[in-house]
Amino acid sequence: SCNAYRIGITGPPGAGKSSITNQLIKHYRKKNKRVGVLLVDPTSPFTHGAILGDRIRMNEYHSDDNVFIRSLATRGSKGGLSKNINYISNILEYAGFDIIIFETVGVGQVELDVVESVDSVVVTLVPESGDDIQIMKAGLIEIADIYVINKYDRKDSDKMYLFLKNMLSMIDKNKWMPPIV
């Protein structure tokens, strides 16, 4: 049956998106789920090449037939994803993968296409993700189903937590309240 659950991992560059993705793979494999991972890397505007290096950090799964990891380049796509990512995710779904994780490039203010492609969005932030205004401008506040404050041992992590908590207090109480973890 084709009913894969799609999870988008997004956030600014260096927030630890690949670390979160790695932990999700581990979690779902313990539950005997087949996991497809589509990692998106930016394309250089100068050379038009891409490093495609995120999967190097996930080499513990290279011999696991129930984990498929593919790096994709943006190739001019401005939304934080690769143009073909939805087609590839459909192929993974038809191939029997239960969970499909989309990891976006480090996002800015207009790179929020992940919302249209997944069932749940995990916004990964770090204490130094920027001041409150920058985070609001980036649009990340509105798209999260779950917030992850990564690298919580760093300075100002409590400040980031309080900022998110205050922002969420303004949301209609009858709507989904994204947890902060």
Language model region names:
Residues 1-7, 15, 24-110, 117-132:
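Nucleotide-state-sensitive switch-loop elements of NTP-binding domains
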Residues 12:
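P-loop (Walker A) phosphate-binding loop of NTP-binding proteins
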Residues 18:
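Walker A/P-loop
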Residues 36, 122-123, 147-150, 154:
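Short hydrophobic alpha-helical runs that function as membrane-insertion/retention elements
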Residues 135:
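Divalent-cation-assisted or electrostatically stabilized phosphate/pyrophosphate-binding catalytic cores
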Residues 143-146, 152-181:
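Canonical P-loop GTPase G-domain recognition
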